[in-house]
């Protein structure tokens, strides 16, 4: 099962592809692992989703807070593991997906709980606020809408950079916070573009419910996060020296490349 076949990719040259060819190569090659990790991520996000839905249906802000706290405990590690799978794909790290997933969960769950709670609280309040706009007898003012959208964009920009750092590095929360701010300033246009892309994606998913629910198991979380991480990866690697640091710390994760002729020759020798 593969929604992104690699039939139009060029012959292997022993080097990484670039641009759209690289994008479709990774999407096709690692679709099965993305599909599996996506299901686990949806499972981790489900307590938060059901909790927010319940609080909105009951119009209770008091129900929203514990729902976001409990949901964040599961959502934080799940999102960090999703980004871990994506960044392993981006740097061509070897290993079976389930072994890598278990390793990422053990390494990241403690560091991801508090950010997960904060993220879910903020996102939950934004979701509840959106419904108050819908319930209100009058439309909100343009200024209110602008502040709402700006806050949502900044939230998306910040956590688009924060989750990958949990997956990639062992750092303090303060260091990650500083890295996010500095990266957003230096690469503001690219970070803003990726945040807007994610918001447009999720807006479309929400507007076209329940039909888009069919897509959730196949492309729900991983597809847009993979796209955003793919676009940000060159800048993040330049800023944080991702591949250099990981290769030094974990030599076994260094990728191995060979052209098609070398691969065929090696396979023939084995046979």
Question: Which residues does each predicted region cover?
Answer:
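Helix-coil boundary and N-terminal low-complexity module in membrane systems
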Residues: 1-131, 135, 141-144, 148, ...
């Amino acid at each position: 099962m593969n929604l992104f076949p690699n039939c139009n990719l060029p012959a292997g040259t022993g080097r990484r592809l670039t641009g759209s060819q690289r994008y479709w190569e990774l999407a096709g090659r690692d679709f099965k692992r993305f599909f599996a990790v996506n299901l686990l991520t949806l499972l981790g996000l489900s307590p938060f989703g059901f909790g927010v839905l319940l609080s909105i249906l009951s119009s209770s802000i008091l129900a929203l807070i514990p729902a976001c706290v409990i949901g964040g405990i599961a959502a934080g590690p799940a999102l960090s593991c999703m980004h871990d799978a994506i960044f392993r794909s981006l740097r061509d790290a070897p290993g079976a997906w389930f072994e890598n997933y278990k390793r990422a969960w053990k390494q990241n769950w403690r560091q991801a709980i508090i950010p997960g709670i904060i993220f879910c609280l903020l996102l939950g309040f934004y979701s509840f606020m959106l419904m108050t706009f819908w319930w209100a007898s009058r439309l909100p003012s343009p200024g209110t809408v602008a502040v709402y959208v700006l806050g949502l964009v900044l939230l998306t920009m910040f956590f688009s950079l924060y989750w990958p750092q949990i997956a990639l590095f062992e750092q303090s929360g303060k260091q990650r916070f500083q890295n996010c701010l500095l990266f957003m300033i230096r690469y503001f246009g690219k970070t803003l573009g990726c945040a807007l892309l994610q918001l447009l994606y999720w807006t479309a998913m929400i507007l076209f419910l329940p039909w888009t629910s069919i897509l959730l198991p196949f492309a729900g979380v991983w597809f847009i996060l993979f796209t955003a991480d793919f676009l940000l990866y060159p800048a993040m690697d330049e800023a944080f020296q991702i591949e250099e640091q990981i290769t030094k710390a974990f030599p076994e994760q260094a990728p191995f490349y060979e052209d098609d002729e070398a691969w065929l020759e090696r396979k023939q020798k084995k046979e």
